[in-house]
Amino acid sequence: YIFYDNDYELFYNDGTILNEFPESYDLRNVSNVSFVTNVKNQGNGGNCWSFSAMAALESAILKATNGAVSLDLSEENMKNLMACFSPFGTTYETNVGGNDRLSNAYLTAGLGPVLESLDNYVPKDYLSAIFNPLTHIQNILWIDRSDYLDNDGIKFALLNYGAVSVSCNFDRDYRNGANHYYYG
């Protein structure tokens, strides 16, 4: 069930789980319905983790409502409330990176999600107000992988719940060029 809006519009997802993976699958067109929202620009804010999490949640809501509810959720509110300048935050500084643990904590603690229209994204801002969350989030699926070829959990999540959020760690040490290189 998804409760949405002040009228508490109720959407029912019958819980059908698909276990067979098709040869190809595109969330942008599943039986002429898109389960992804528009691409957003984080600029140089170091907040990809927040954008990834909100895009996955927006996709999950689209998937659960068969495209009936499309939301633009606030990455700004998430990244600021989970940083060191917030009473709910961690030791992470704002705008210099994060991870899925932060986004999951924000959502399951009831701090969000909130709409983008309440707290617009500004790449280098540090503070956000606390708003009532749009809906309650629970049962976040955390996918473990045994190695880089173990992708069935990701396929299962894409097929049944929508987009996924993926964390990765980049450090200046990766720029050494000996056997790996990252420049971002």
Each model region followed by its residue ranges:
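N-terminal zymogen propeptides
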Residues: Y1-D26
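A short glycine/serine-rich beta->alpha loop
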Residues: S34-G46, F88-Y92
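Predominantly the structural core of cysteine protease catalytic domains
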Residues: F21, D26-N29, W49-E58, D72, ...
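Alpha-helical support elements that line or immediately flank enzyme active sites
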Residues: Q42-N66
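Short, flexible coil/linker elements and helix-boundary hinge sites characteristic
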Residues: E9, G15, T65-N66, G110
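Short, glycine/acidic-rich hinge or "gate" loops at secondary-structure transitions
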Residues: T65-L73
